[in-house]
């Protein structure tokens, strides 16, 4: 895959990473989410918004494209095609990471998808398109969408559409679901897992299980930051999945780190460890995060306003005789991430509801993640970020 990615697709991946870092900074600066563990899937949100852009016209399309950071809507679809077909292809049969990614378009029977939109959804995004009855069977359709997501995510995301979120005003739902399960190349010995102190943002501490290892690790220390790179077992292709742990030296440095990542687009690439180093001590807490948000306000903070208002233009999505157009009313997103001695299991889903308008390291180092840190799961050949989040207390699961 490394030699087949076109230049415009690589540029789109860079834009997707920039979008991920901006969103992470927005989440970290939100008082509610900053006080708890958080996780989200940039590739899930980016894909859902890219598919939304396929049905948008005029200024709405331009604003979606600008928010997602690419110059043309065609770049979004080219990236989606590469992500669906290659980056997130399942490699479990050859000993690599298990990956599943599915897109779905659920449209009310009173509307017809435009052939041009349906072609992009099916051919580029490999989306299932289904005609449903929101008018009289909203509860049944909610169960249908939730069951579809639950199946793709192996039961990790159960209710992407909250009870009562879909009613007879709903006209269309764009949804996707992502599942990832990867085993560490070098698994941690569970006998070495011991309780130790993790220091919280308020200065207090909790005891939590820490994994340990005597192995050399990919580690870089620079600019008041330590970056750990943990590889997952590779399958029969050239994809390389890694988890990155970004640990600020200052115990309270989480928010400033998120701001720096957002402000400097190449910050992550400049701080990727390239070599293994010997460690005196290595401690990484086990953690499990379930995180859900209604992301409309976060996206508005990034400059995406038009799709949510009465000026929204989604004339390229459906054929309709109704005088009103469509607008986005809700963007539901959920993510699950669990890290333990064997590896990582992660899942995510995004659902968009639409209604009618109204430096070189020293030879020996320590890595002790005993205070809040950022993490991300990335496929390194392409650079696509699958999951991202922060841990402020490993004992909190939701």
UniProtKB/Swiss-Prot annotation:
InterPro entries: Serpin_CS (IPR023795), Serpin_dom (IPR023796), Serpin_fam (IPR000215), Serpin_sf (IPR036186), Serpin_sf_1 (IPR042178), Serpin_sf_2 (IPR042185). Belongs to the serpin family. GO terms for cellular component: extracellular space. Keywords: Protease inhibitor, Serine protease inhibitor. Inhibits chymotrypsin and cathepsin G in vitro. The reactive center loop (RCL) extends out from the body of the protein and directs binding to the target protease. The protease cleaves the serpin at the reactive site within the RCL, establishing a covalent linkage between the carboxyl group of the serpin reactive site and the serine hydroxyl of the protease. The resulting inactive serpin-protease complex is highly stable. This is Serpin-Z1A. It comes from the Eukaryota. Pfam families: Serpin (PF00079). Residues 343-367 are annotated as: RCL. The record marks 357-358 as: Reactive bond. One of its GO terms (molecular function) is serine-type endopeptidase inhibitor activity. CDD domains: serpinP_plants (cd02043).
């Amino acid at each position: 895959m490394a030699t087949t990615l076109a230049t415009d697709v690589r540029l789109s991946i860079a834009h997707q990473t920039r979008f991920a870092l901006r969103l992470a900074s927005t989440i970290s600066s939100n008082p509610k989410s900053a006080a708890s563990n958080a996780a989200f899937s940039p590739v899930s949100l980016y894909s859902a918004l890219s598919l939304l852009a396929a049905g948008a016209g005029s200024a709405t399309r331009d604003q979606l494209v600008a928010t997602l950071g690419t110059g043309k809507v065609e770049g979004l679809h080219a990236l989606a095609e590469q992500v669906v077909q290659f980056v997130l292809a399942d490699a479990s049969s050859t000993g690599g990471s298990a990956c599943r990614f599915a897109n779905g378009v659920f449209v009310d029977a009173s509307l017809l998808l435009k052939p041009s939109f349906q072609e992009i959804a099916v051919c580029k995004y490999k989306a299932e398109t289904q005609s449903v009855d929101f008018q009289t069977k909203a509860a049944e359709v909610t169960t249908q969408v939730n069951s579809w997501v639950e199946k793709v995510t192996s039961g990790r995301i159960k209710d992407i559409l909250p009870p009562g979120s879909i009613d007879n005003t709903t006209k269309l739902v764009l949804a996707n679901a992502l599942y990832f399960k990867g085993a560490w190349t070098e698994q941690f010995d569970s006998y070495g897992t011991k309780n130790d102190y993790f220091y919280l943002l308020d200065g207090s501490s909790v005891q939590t299980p820490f994994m340990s290892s005597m192995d050399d690790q990919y580690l870089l220390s620079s600019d008041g930051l330590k970056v750990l790179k943990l590889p997952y077992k590779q399958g029969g292709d050239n994809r390389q999945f890694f988890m990155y742990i970004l640990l600020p030296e200052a115990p309270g440095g989480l928010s400033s780190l998120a701001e720096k990542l957002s402000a400097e687009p190449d910050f992550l690439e400049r701080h990727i460890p390239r070599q293994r180093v010997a460690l005196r001590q290595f401690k990484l807490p086990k953690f499990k995060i379930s995180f859900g948000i209604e992301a409309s306000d976060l996206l508005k903070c990034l400059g995406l306003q038009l799709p949510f208002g009465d000026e929204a233009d989604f004339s390229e999505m459906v054929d309709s005789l109704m005088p009103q157009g469509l607008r986005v009313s809700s963007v539901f997103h959920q993510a699950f991430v669990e890290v333990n001695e064997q590896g990582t299991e992660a899942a995510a889903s995004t659902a968009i509801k639409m209604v009618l308008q109204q430096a070189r390291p020293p030879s020996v180092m320590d890595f002790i993640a005993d205070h809040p840190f950022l993490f991300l799961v990335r496929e390194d050949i392409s650079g696509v970020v699958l999951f991202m989040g922060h841990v402020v207390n490993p004992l909190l699961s939701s």
